[in-house]
Amino acid sequence: LGRAQQILDLTQAQSFGDIVSQVAVAADSAEPGQWIFGRGWHQDKWQPEDIDTVEGVPTNKSINQVAPDNPVYLVHASGHAAFANDAALRAAGVTGATDDPTGGTIVRDAQGRATGLLRENAQKLVEGSIAEYIALQTPAQRQQSLHEQVELAGQLALAHGITSFHDAGVGFDDI
């Protein structure tokens, strides 16, 4: 719950342009190299736009322009796909020549370039780089992030009249 408050909420985006705008705002306040995360986009909710698409989804060109120095990773509402900019693909070593993983697809344009759309198991290619990025954080940075997540979750719960909750799936290290 707290983690969801730290990333871009893309559930209300009515166009790909809305998503690009949210990423641009996040990139303006992010340090170079800092990852930008989001979740909840769904192309069927978008108004038609005059932009390049492959298989009904825009390419990552617009996001590359607004966040050239920040890897961007945006998970589809279903969780079965994700959208990555070129910085995220580079961090993961994904190119147009990268083989599709078993059970996944790296969507490519007519020239064979990766468009940024990763389906199913192809998401794991970039998620491995995200795990490496998080592992590079100091223990103090990870602790601060967890503290912020708990604080944000508590604030959201209180705003809805929920005064207590627990998570039986969290280990003692995270508590």
What are these regions (language model features)?
Residues L1-I175:
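Divalent metal-binding segments
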